[in-house]
């Protein structure tokens, strides 16, 4: 069993890359459902199932109401035990390896306490994978959000 859902990570980024940006955030609910996410009734907030269960996805918008940056807590183990905290690092390493295999060398990376690795695609989007002490987070910048990267 793939506890980190590496294939799901790659598949999600690929699906986000392929969306017909720009998409207005107030019209994103049907697209979210196609991604397997559930609208919450609040614009820009969705729920989805990831490697460590159901998580909340948040999306910011630009001045034109277009979706700009998605924040997705992809791996967040429950509990405070040191073993579970170590899982966040293992998940990050697994996702980076899968990303390098799928998309090649990242264009930006920092490896330290809060490590991150980012890939930029010809569609003018960025997938930024971030490892915090206790979880792994994916920040996806649409063409409308890329200027804030």
In which residue ranges do the predicted regions lie?
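Short helix/turn-capping signatures at newly exposed starts of structured segments
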Residues: 1-113, 122-126, 130-149
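Short hydrophobic/aromatic beta-strand element in the GNAT-like acyltransferase core
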Residues: 116
């Amino acid at each position: 069993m793939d506890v980190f859902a590496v294939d799901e990570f790659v598949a999600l980024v690929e699906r986000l890359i392929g969306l017909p940006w720009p998409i207005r955030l107030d019209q994103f609910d049907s697209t979210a459902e196609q991604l397997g996410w559930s609208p919450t009734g609040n614009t820009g907030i969705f729920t989805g199932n990831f490697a460590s269960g159901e998580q909340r996805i948040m999306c910011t918008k630009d001045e034109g109401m277009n979706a700009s940056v998605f924040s997705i807590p992809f791996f967040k183990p429950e509990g405070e035990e040191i073993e579970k905290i170590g899982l966040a690092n293992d998940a990050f390493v697994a996702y980076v390896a899968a990303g390098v295999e799928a998309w090649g060398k990242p264009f930006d990376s920092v490896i330290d306490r809060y490590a991150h690795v980012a890939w930029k695609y010809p569609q003018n989007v960025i997938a930024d994978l971030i490892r915090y002490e206790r979880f792994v987070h994916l920040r996806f910048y649409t063409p409308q959000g890329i200027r804030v990267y």
